[in-house]
Amino acid sequence: MIKKDRVKRGGVIKTHIRVVEGYRPGPGLPTKQRTIKSFGYLEDQPDPEAFMAMVAKFDDNFKDTVPLRIEVAANAMMYGEENRRQNYGYKFLEAVYNLLEINSFIENFEKSRKFRVEYSPCDIFKFLVFARVLHPDSKRASCQLKDGFYGMCTDFTLPDVYRSLDHFADFEVELQRHLNERVKETIGRDLSYAFYDVTNYFFEIDFPNGEEDLRKRGVSKEHRTDPIVAMGLFMDSNGLPVNMSMFPGNTSDSLTLQPTMKDVKDSYGLGRLIVVADKGLNSSKNINAIVNNGDGFVFSQIIKGKKGQRYNEKLFDQSGWTSNEQGTYRYKLFEEEYEGKDKDGKKEIRVRKVLLYWKKTEADMAKRKREEKLEKAARSVKNNAYSIKKGVDEYTKEAIVDKETGEILGNTKKLRSVNLEKAEHDAMYDGYFCIISSELEYDERKMRQVYGGLWQIEQSFRIMKTDLYARPVFVRKNEHIRAHFLICFIALLIIRIIQHRMGEKALSAERIARTLGAATCQVLKGGIIHLDDVGGAIAFQKALNKKGEIVDTLAYSDRDEIAMDYKLIQDTFGTSLYNIYPRQELFNKFLKNITVA
């Protein structure tokens, strides 16, 4: 039936049109209504009469559907095939996978290497990519679920999977080149800026296996002591991954940029690049290499310590700042000369743009964090306790004193105290930030805008670690480690392409995976498919915050968040199927029509 709901949107009363049906959620329970399809607001339609005629036709077709008679044996067992749920949500991932023509690449690579085995590397690779999105786990645990995908060919064993990893590592570089070409052809690659960052992933092992092992102890981003591997990631201006490179865990972040950048430019035939990175990649060697290659850079710059002292005079000079009306933001923009080296190692004077700015919100946040650390330091000193946790001992200091007089002497007794001098010194830099760039024509807004794009690569790392469970890593061999991260890279690329297609309505990686994981079905007798409810999470009501952004409130709505997300995904892929019991031929046709336009 057609239901018209009067709702208030933007201060205006509108008529929300939807087709609903009645159902009984359980024996003895009152009937409820559920939405079959939502058509939007009547007042927003250019031709309301034609619009309602279309809704009525949909309603009639839905009501006129021939009822199905499904027979179920009274002695049917719980663990029979008819009662097995299989996922079909992976088909939306497969549409992007097919767009990238990964199967064709692997098949051609096998032919060129005359690689012949009894199992299908194509099937294994595809399965591992989809499992990484929907059920991220170890290779062993993932293979235990291989029969849970509708229509997917999974005729392989766990040993086949491990053997395939060696093969996958062989085409790590070539596949990334292929993916770049496919992205350029089908979506468009915007490399006006190349965003670069490095992270690392840990292994729950005690010791690496030798000098050649990628797993090394190094500076962990998560402050762990386990062996790690490092990953350098390039991303384009659309937020789509471009290139991934792996390094031993003890490699300094700053040493990864030049080899990765050279590989990207040589492999992809790129012209001038403007590299955007944080201060961890900002070194004189990197800057010299970038400029000598005819490329550009936008880096954040340390303003504390020896490396940042050159800016202290301008930073603490109260004149020359440009401020906003509220006094919550101010900046200085100027050019400076610096000493660089040409390709022959000869020194020369070069010029770059420097932006110093201060934000009150950042200053307030830095103050709060420091006060919290000082409280921890005071408790640590009081209890004479040490900690390996980050920040706990940042504001403590030690002195060797004479037990009798307190005079500082050699080798008698350690006295710990709160380092208030360091806290006062750090407070001077609260809220200040520095960006440097080779692009002399950039103004203040442009420099902040370009550097601000780095959040997308940071988000990509979070997706890989949190949503794709890229760590801890369970494989051991270098080839298997490279294959594992290649699979994670492609899973990330597929998610990013889906988000790119969604535009401003893009869902988070977690919600995409949750929704597609909930798209399950059962194959019944007589060529009937039972589609499970793609739902199960109550949506919260929305409201505008002080910044004019739409955010969740604490109040429940009458809608299902997963169901809404599934509709958005179907709309993105140009499909629409909400029948509970479609015939198998109709269902297969629906799956076949899931494509990326």
Feature map (PLM): residue ranges:
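Conserved glycine(s) in the ABC-transporter nucleotide-binding domain "signature"
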Residues: 1-122
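Anion-binding and metal-coordination hotspots
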Residues: 2-3, 16, 26, 103-597
